[in-house]
Swiss-Prot record:
Keyword set includes DNA damage: no
Organism classification: Bacteria, Pseudomonadati, Pseudomonadota, Gammaproteobacteria, Enterobacterales
Organism: Klebsiella pneumoniae (strain 342)
Family matches, as Gene3D superfamilies: Methylthiotransferase, N-terminal domain, tm_1862 like domain
Protein's name according to its UniProt entry: tRNA-2-methylthio-N(6)-dimethylallyladenosine synthase
Chain's role: Catalyzes the methylthiolation of N6-(dimethylallyl)adenosine (i(6)A), leading to the formation of 2-methylthio-N6-(dimethylallyl)adenosine (ms(2)i(6)A) at position 37 in tRNAs that read codons beginning with uridine.
Cofactor note: Binds 2 [4Fe-4S] clusters. One cluster is coordinated with 3 cysteines and an exchangeable S-adenosyl-L-methionine.
Subunit composition and interactions: Monomer.
Keyword list, A-Z: 4Fe-4S, Cytoplasm, Iron, Iron-sulfur, Metal-binding, S-adenosyl-L-methionine, Transferase, tRNA processing
Boundaries of every TRAM domain copy: 378-441
Length: 474
């Protein structure tokens, strides 16, 4: 009988990536098949996020629902991972004693051993340590799921912004070796992946070891990834302005595979608030980066993160944020009302901004960003955009759907053989959440760059005597 695994994931793209790796790992070692139905699973895993308000209570509410399933099936294994587990592991065990496994973001690769231990002696396992890069060395060969894929290139953060729990839950910055990253991407390219999104809590801080023992820069890595045949679109997230150096900007000038879209969080337009946040950059320095980016890539569009109502934020501070939004002309944003994360310096600050002011500021900010996003979309009307075709449209099975470089969804009439390939379309209609296009060119007519085949990258980066991401043996 097939054993089944159910994973519920909250939070960032890194958590989504981690969950996909958990599924692949437990399929390879134990034969667990994913199911969307928790009631039919043999193992339930909750991959948590501690960024949002009341994250801990959300975890216990979910575990309470799963407790009912365990009462019906005592052999059911329940595991909690992610950042809340890393931060609150002991508390979870005390409050939810029926949880069998608690693991952190850096120990998910040990899940097979943890499950074996629970199956063997029914004693709970807690492992929320930070074993640096070992996690990546023991994951199975990646499996493509469509033409796009996420690839984690580093973990952790050293910036210690006063509101953020990431350094405490994922540890300090650790970069994967260059060859390991190229090996994984080449494997994905050989399976038909055309777009990769490089992931890290502070992705542009990557400083990985090269094959010759030297240390590579993030700009170097971008060019190496772009050289892999089949990888014709590269994204990365999330970046920090303090390490967005000129050599990265130069990649935008000479590497067409790097998309004309960047998510670069700024959080506030007020230098005083930025200082309280521990951001180590000013609004003017942020704008200088954007100016240089637009000199290198005039059509680049920018998105960002904003926190409103940070302790001490005045009306004048908020107005400076709104001015920055207008000056940069952001295309989109992820914006939130401040809520204190336990254990962070900001949690000890006086939360002196009235709740109504916070809500009003968030509304004003989001309305302005939405207006700017629609203006950007309208500018695309009549232009030709390159689309990576992801599949059929959600609105009509008779149409295809894909995304532009700036993440706009485009629906258009096409043929099934276009899925997983690029097409150029003319934008003929603009809607609130999507665009409509008409095909003007297929991939065969594009003359995309060919530099190095995935097979040659795999052969060049494979290490027979090392563990490596591709040869984990359960």
């Amino acid at each position: 009988m097939t054993k089944k695994l159910h994973i519920k994931t909250w939070g960032c793209q890194m958590n989504e990536y981690d969950s996909s790796k958990m599924a692949d790992l437990l399929d390879a070692t134990h034969g667990y098949q994913l199911t969307e139905v928790a009631e039919e699973a043999d193992v339930l895993l909750l991959n948590t996020c501690s960024i949002r308000e009341k994250a801990q209570e959300k975890v216990f509410h979910q575990l309470g629902r799963w407790k009912l399933l365990k009462e019906k099936n005592p052999d059911l294994i329940i595991g909690v991972g992610g950042c809340v587990a890393s931060q609150e592991g002991d508390h979870i065990r005390q409050r939810a004693h029926y949880v069998d496994i608690i693991f952190g973001p850096q120990t998910l690769h040990r899940l097979p051993e943890m499950i074996n231990a629970v199956r063997g002696n029914r004693s709970p396992v807690v492992d929320i340590s930070f074993p640096e890069i070992e996690k990546f060395d023991r994951l199975p060969e990646p499996r493509a799921d469509g033409p796009t894929a996420f690839v984690s290139i580093m973990e952790g953060c050293n910036k210690y912004c006063t509101y953020c729990v990431v350094p405490y839950t994922r540890g300090e910055e650790v970069s994967r070796p260059c060859d390991d990253i190229l090996f994984e991407i080449a494997q994905l390219a050989a399976q038909g992946v055309r777009e990769v999104n490089l992931l890290g809590q502070n992705v542009n801080a990557w400083r990985g070891e090269n094959y010759d023992g030297t240390t590579g820069s993030f700009a170097d890595l971008l060019r190496l990834v772009a050289a892999i045949d089949g990888i014709d679109r590269i994204r990365f997230t999330t970046s920090h302005p303090i390490e967005f150096t000129d050599d990265i900007i130069e990649v935008y000038r000479d590497t067409p595979e790097l998309v004309s879209f960047l998510h670069l969080p700024v959080q506030s337009g007020s230098d005083r608030v930025l200082n309280l946040m521990g951001r180590t950059h000013t609004a003017l320095e942020y704008k200088a980066i954007i100016r240089k980016l637009r000199e290198a890539r005039p059509d680049i569009q920018i998105s960002s993160d904003f926190i409103v109502g940070f302790p001490g934020e005045t009306t004048d501070d908020f107005e400076k944020t709104m001015k920055l939004i207008a000056d940069v002309n952001f295309d989109m944003s992820y914006s939130f009302i401040f809520s204190a994360r336990p254990g962070t310096p900001a949690a000890d600050m006086v939360d002196d901004v009235p709740e109504e002011d916070k809500k009003q500021r968030l509304y004003i900010l989001q309305e302005r960003i939405n207006q700017q996003a629609m203006a950007w979309s309208r500018r695309m009307l009549g232009t030709v955009q390159r689309i990576l075709v992801e599949g059929t449209s959600r609105k009509s099975l008779m149409e295809l759907s894909g995304r532009t470089e700036n993440n706009r969804v485009v629906n258009f009439e096409g043929t099934p053989d276009m899925v997983g390939k690029f097409v150029d379309v003319e934008i003929v209609d603009v809607y609130t959440n999507s665009l409509r296009g008409k095909i003007v060119r297929t991939e065969a007519e594009m003359g995309l760059r060919i530099a190095e085949s995935p097979e040659s990258v795999i052969a060049r980066t494979r290490k027979e005597n090392d563990l490596g991401v591709g040869i984990y043996q359960p």
